[in-house]
């Protein structure tokens, strides 16, 4: 492994993971969806022990290579740092580790997991932060480019491309993503991997393991002349050139120091060959090790325990629909329950980006902050679509088949008589009846004694699956006359 190979691998991973959040066709996920599932925190929440063990072994073998290659937020910081390097070369300096801050941030994540507020802890989780940045800022640009290409192709009588809607997913997520992006840019532009070594809880855990990695960058004191060039180019600020020491808990194995050393005094070699190197600049005491091990055990135990406007034929004024006041929020099919979603979802926004019907959006409620909730102002949850269950890397939305989805009831339809155009405007309407995919809605005479009286909908809640077709296609504005009330725990019909 050298820095060039590391950069190439990092760019490949970064590009493909980014495309997972940008692609609206589903083609990218078919081939590269596994890249989301090998992210550390999603793998832990999904209890994907194979991936977790694999990442632990990789770290024990090569150090924090995960942070330089697999983690998209790490590569994004390297991109920001590259701009900083263009502004000023040799700008880094060695700094002492901010261990207390690192442990506090890890503790915040653990407490959030224990309390079931996974999305709150996900505010500082690397994969989730990157997902919000990609889906909020990069996806609209990608979609605009696609629409321009589709428009040009159409002018050439080609329909190889199609336009997609670009919609506002919510102000809260935008603000959080913007603050995260700006903070990361400032930190990385000035100081390289500050986030990774002070805030990122994944970096803290892997940093503990990397102290004992088999392969390490080692300083050969017989060749080193103490020029400090390696330290001034270390993005992790972990090389103490005066004492010929490297803090392996913060080293992200970028291997830039090896490229910069003119004396060839730094090698990436097995631990057994490190006899000529100075001791690590940040040796861990037993208290710190116990703290990390303890919090890891608590986290593992808690996770294991937790486990466009529509034309309506002139029936109503054309205006945007408003979200009904649901007593129980709707969660996506496959999420099992509101609790399961809250305890496993990292609010990465991948399911929201992948939803072709635009029914998923980030929640603003503290209990499920930025996690997906189902709403039907822009579309409805088509029975044949299982995209969200296919892309979720954490198990917050379990994989389900199309057949299984048709038997999952995430909620049931409720009719509001005062909002219905039949009652309010004395107009004939049977939109909900005609579009219900399960036949759960029947039309009956408003006046049982007069068969010619206007017909109103009657809902069979035993057949309704809560897809929202009735709510979405209802011509009543601003509130639909029929809406879906959610279930805390999904039911099978």
Predicted feature residues:
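Non-ligating segments of multi-cofactor redox enzymes
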Residues: 1-244, 249-250, 256-493
